[in-house]
């Protein structure tokens, strides 16, 4: 759940072809770590630099979170003014680059946030022939309307692309043509309205809509 919008993976029915295939002897069977069917959201696809708070609910959460029966992780991203921030990180496991900026137009009661993120991860530093690359882009807006009953509008558009790849090490006596690669591209659009009703039985009316399209192969 990101900014009140569930991340639904119910339609993901893909699994790795050739579950018994071994790309390199030290990596084990390919399907052991790549089959994510019925296992929830792949947390590697979520950029962390935009996160402001994280809430973890154990057990069966409220119905507002959707058809969840084993807990939920709620992520709230940064909103409003933030200075231009660029970050680069490199270690034995990953390389990461991030740039983001937030604007707040006080007169217009409008907040805008933009960010780009790139990650090149090496899950096992002993196996230099396997990597996981992720790139994300995000644009978010929040607008407050000064009416008798305050109205807040939220909009966001997010893109995530990943490449998961492994190939044989020619130094261990295997042919190089035996390789594994999967790509994933997702675009998600979310729109929300929150209307505060101070003098009625209903305190707040909330309407949220979202559209998500994925290309996974």
Regions found by a protein language model. Name each.
Residues 53, 85-87, 111-115, 152-156, ...:
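Residue-level detector of the transmembrane beta-barrel scaffold of outer-membrane proteins
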Residues 119-138, 142-204, 208-217:
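Flexible loop and strand-edge segments within Gram-negative outer membrane beta-barrel domains
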Residues 65-68, 88-98, 125-131:
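Solvent-exposed loop/turn segments connecting transmembrane beta-strands
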Residues 1, 40-44, 67-87:
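N-terminal periplasmic accessory domains that precede
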Residues 5-57:
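Short acidic/polar hinge/loop motifs at secondary-structure boundaries
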Residues 38-41, 70, 94-98, 134-138, ...:
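Transmembrane beta-barrel architecture of outer-membrane proteins
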Residues 77-78, 82-93, 112-122:
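Transmembrane beta-strand segments that form the barrel wall of outer-membrane beta-barrel proteins
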Residues 49, 81-83, 96, 105-111, ...:
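Strand-connecting loop/turn motifs
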